[in-house]
Amino acid sequence: MSSSKSIDLKSKFLKVYDTLKSDLINDPAFEFDDDSRQWIQKMLDYNVPGGKLNRGLSVVDSYQLLKGGELSDDEIFLSSALGWCIEWLQAYFLVLDDIMDESHTRRGQPCWFRLPKVGMIAANDGILLRNHVPRILKKHFRGKPYYVDLVDLFNEVEFQTASGQMIDLITTLVGEKDLSKYSLSIHRRIVQYKTAYYSFYLPVACALLMFGEDLDKHVEVKNVLVEMGTYFQVQDDYLDCFGAPEVIGKIGTDIEDFKCSWLVVKALELANEEQKKTLHENYGKKDPASVAKVKEVYHTLNLQAVFEDYEATSYKKLITSIENHPSKAVQAVLKSFLGKIYKRQK
């Protein structure tokens, strides 16, 4: 897609956000007053449109590649609305995630719950964000033949994501800091459920449903996208430690938070006894000296090179899987996704 076309689609996409926001603050199911309307407006503007919007825009891109031609205004609106549903879902997860992780910044600004007038009201805001998704689906898709499948899809992916978050939280239980619990297979399970389904499978599944496809016939597409999601999360883990905070928009805290990160799992695999001891003694501690010791082990083990090797291998494997797919349109969708994340810096 030419860059001017994608800029045009992005501006249309952003306009749809305003329409959906207006629908929600005028929802007939609730009697809004000025205060509640202003709160919702501020909360939405702060949390929903601030990211890269990759997930949301991917629905529009994917639908366009499946259709193979220009989209009507109605198709642009509907695919954008589905894209925004994913961005809403993402906002709901992040608002609550930041509270659970006691994070400080998100997308280059303070986390929503860190704002003086917000605090724990953010927990209810997260619930509201989650409840906005079915409101949007009902208003704009209720008459569509794929409506029930859409509702099912969002419910299932939300369940998978929340369950992935649970494995992440109980594996990283503070007070039970036991690095020996961490392995590549646990890392993979967390990633698959917590990130891959909603970030990678969901946008393409939305486009496929809108295009009239049966998701049961696209299991292979799901598998490739889950693999892509795993690769994406490994990049994220890498950038948390090695990325520049001003570029990635947040200060990485995976080491302090005792996260089951790809880096620590790889380090444990490659480390000698002394390095393992250093990791066991310092991983998950908040003080800068401990964090520095963990990073020193990462540098000594040359995890940057190990990651680059992983990135190259993953890319090759993904391209091979994609090119095995019988449909050129589906191949284009998957390649477009991979192109967006390969060698990303943020």
From Swiss-Prot:
UniProtKB keywords: Isoprene biosynthesis, Magnesium, Metal-binding, Transferase
Single GO cellular component term: cytoplasm
Binding site for isopentenyl diphosphate: 52, 55, 90, 107
Cofactor: Mg(2+); Mn(2+)
Gene3D superfamilies with a match to the protein in the record: Farnesyl Diphosphate Synthase
PROSITE patterns xrefs: POLYPRENYL_SYNTHASE_1, POLYPRENYL_SYNTHASE_2
Motif (DDXXD motif): 97-101, 236-240
Tissue: Highly expressed in shoots.
Annotated EC: 2.5.1.1, 2.5.1.10
Pfam families found in the cross-reference section: polyprenyl_synt (PF00348)
UniProt keyword Transferase, yes or no: yes
CDD domains according to UniProt: Trans_IPPS_HT
Purpose of the protein: Catalyzes the sequential condensation of isopentenyl pyrophosphate (IPP) with the allylic pyrophosphates, dimethylallyl pyrophosphate (DMAPP), and then with the resultant geranylpyrophosphate (GPP) to the ultimate product farnesyl pyrophosphate (FPP). Has a 4.5 time greater affinity for GPP versus DMAPP.
Free-text note regarding domains: The Asp-Asp-Xaa-Xaa-Asp/Glu (DDXXD/E) motif is important for the catalytic activity, presumably through binding to Mg(2+).
Protein name: Farnesyl diphosphate synthase 1
